[in-house]
Amino acid sequence: MLEVDCTMLTPEVVLRTSGHVARFADWMCKDKASGEIFRADHLVEQVLEDRLKSDKEARGQVIGPDDPTSNKKKLKIKKKAPIKLDDEKVALYDRYLAQVGAHPCLVTDMQIDNLSGDELARIIKDEDIRNPQTGGVLEPPVPFNLMFETQIGPSGDKQGYLRPETAQGQFLNFQKLLDFNNSRMPFASASIGKSFRNEISPRSGLLRVREFLMAEIEHFVDPRNKKHDRFKEVEGQVCAFLPRGVQDAGSTQTLKDTIGHAVETKMVDNETLGYFLARIWMFLEKIGCDMSKVRFRQHMRNEMAHYASDCWDAELLTSYVSPPVSTFLCRLQ
C-alpha cells in the first residue's frame, strides 16, 4: 500500500469533472419570517419522530431512555401536551422513518435521506411541518452545495475548493502511483488528512462538523477482473446485511449471510468489494465491538455517489446515534 499526502486546495475543474460541483449537495429550507436555515431531511425526521413520541405518550406508552425514537440530537422544541395520532398517520410516519419491521436497535432514517427535493417539499406541505421553535412557515427546499469555495492566487480568477474528501488527490496521482508500483495491478494507496464540508446544520457532537479528519484507502483493480486472490480466506464470514431491496420495502430487518453467498448472488457486486467488507467486519469484531449492533447497509440507487456502481456503509449503533464508521465504494470504470 502506497502512502500519499495531497493538497487540501482543489482546482474547480477537478471537482467539476468529478461531478461534485453539480451534485455534492444537501436540501436546505428557510423560515420565511426569521430566515433561519434548516437541513430539510433532518428537520422532517425530527418533527415526525417528535410526533410519534408524543403519540406514544398520549397512548400511555413509556418512552425509555434507550427507546430508538427518543430525541438526542434535535433542536429544542417547546414542550406541548401529548397528541394522539390516528393509526394511518402513525403507519405513514413509520414508513417515512423506515421503522416497519425493524430490529429495535437498528432504527435509522434511511427513507428520509433518500427523498428528493420535491418529495421533501410535499411532506413539509402535507404534514404542515414548520420551524420547531417559532412555528414559522418554511420555504420549499433548495439544493445547497457543501463545498467551501475559494479563489486561488492574487488575481482571484482561479476558482477552487477546500477538498470535501481525500479521494480526489489519490485519483489525480494515479499515474504516478501506478508508475511507482511498476505498472502492476491491483495496488492500493492511502491518505489521511483534513477534509471540509459546509454543513447546513452541524450537530450530533463531533459526528457532523465542518472540518474533520478522515482516512481513505483506494484499492485499484483491473475493471475486467475484480476477483481477489485471497477471497477464499473470508468467503465463509457471516455478516449482517441491509440490502436496498429490504429498504425499498420499508424495512430495516437485517439479513445474515456469508460473504461468499452475498457475492455469488450479486447482492455484493464483486469479490474485491466482498473481501474488504469481510475484513472490516473481522476488524470491528477484533477491537471489541458488539457485533449485534453492527451492520452493512447498502446505499439506495438515488443515494449512491454518482460515480459508484455499489456502495455499503458499515454502521455501528452507539448510545448517541447510528453513524457509519466506514464506507465501501465500488466505483464505475
Task: Describe each PLM feature range.
Residues 1-333:
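TRNA-recognition modules of translation machinery and tRNA-sensing kinases, especially anticodon-binding
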